[in-house]
Design a protein with these regions (language model features):
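Conserved core of the sugar-phosphate nucleotidyltransferase
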Residues: 105-177
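Short beta-strand/turn micro-motifs composed of small residues
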Residues: 7, 26, 52, 99, ...
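A structural signal for short hydrophobic beta-strand segments in well-ordered beta-sheet cores
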Residues: 22, 134-136, 199
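Short glycine-enriched, charge-decorated loop/helix-capping segments at active-site entrances
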Residues: 18-24, 73
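Short beta-strand-to-loop acidic/aromatic patch adjacent to the donor-nucleotide binding site
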Residues: 93-103
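Conserved N-terminal catalytic core of the sugar/cofactor nucleotidyltransferase
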Residues: 2, 29-95
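N-terminal nucleotide-binding beta1-loop-alpha1 segment
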Residues: 1-16
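Conserved alpha/beta core of the MobA/IspD/sugar-nucleotide pyrophosphorylase nucleotidyltransferase superfamily
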Residues: 1-3, 155-227
Length: 227
């Protein structure tokens, strides 16, 4: 299994000058360092690809032993195009991908890795306008996933997996996305084409996407509790 970490964006909402994945947590490690440590434990460093863009040198100098793909249109494209750049380097393997600003417990990864189908990590928390939301078909698989889903069952937290048999179709739909589309648009297109995507409920695990200073404060409080 390969891993793609999406770390190309500017992250202006957090109000910092460095790439958001390098944001330091309360324990002194960066968001990206925490991700890489956990991913290496389960899947190995050689299987990790990081998509970089904004101030790419800072990330590459911090983690010189990783494989990198540069999205030179990082300032005019969104996660659909960054993910496609990474997947174009991968042939015939399952792929786990995640946003580079998600802080999570290590054990959460096993839930995704061990799922036998393409899947996404979700919770059943209340959601606001900015969160990526989801709902389900009657069979329990993902139906819709976007910021505009209403009513929504919870949040899609930005950690996902595509299995080998779905990879070609998913890549094709990423190619159909507009530059400013999130990768979830390609998931919706693939679901419309018949791809089955399972929700993996991670509500019992620590998992938070860091978009704003308040998120950083909240995750710092959670980490104080030893998670």
């Amino acid at each position: 299994m390969k891993v793609v970490i999406l770390a190309a964006g500017i992250g202006s909402r957090l109000g910092i000058s460095d790439p958001k994945p390098l944001t330091k947590l309360k324990n002194g490690e960066s968001i990206l360092q925490r991700q890489i440590t956990y991913l290496c434990e389960y899947l190995g460093m050689n299987n990790i690809i990081v998509i970089v863009g904004y101030k790419k040198e800072l990330i590459m100098e911090s983690f010189p032993n990783l494989v990198y793909v540069y999205n030179n249109f990082y300032d005019t494209t969104n996660t659909s195009k960054s993910l496609l750049a990474g997947l174009n380097k991968i042939e015939e393997e399952d792929v786990l991908w995640l946003n580079g600003d998600v802080v999570f417990e290590k054990e959460l990864l096993l839930q995704i890795i061990q799922c036998p189908q393409s899947c996404m990590a979700v919770n059943i928390n209340s959601v606001g306008e900015e969160e990526i939301k989801y709902n389900l078909f009657e069979d329990g698989s993902i139906k819709d996933v976007s910021k505009s889903v209403n009513p929504a069952l919870g949040e899609a937290v930005g950690i996902n997996k595509i299995i080998i048999s779905d990879l070609h179709q998913f890549k094709a739909n990423l190619g159909k996305c507009h530059n400013q589309d999130y990768f979830e648009k390609a998931l919706e297109l693939s679901i419309q084409d018949g791809m089955n995507v399972l929700p993996v409920d991670i509500s019992d695990f620590l998992c938070m996407e860091i978009d704003f200073i308040d998120d950083l404060r909240e995750i710092s409080n959670q980490l104080k509790l030893g998670k």
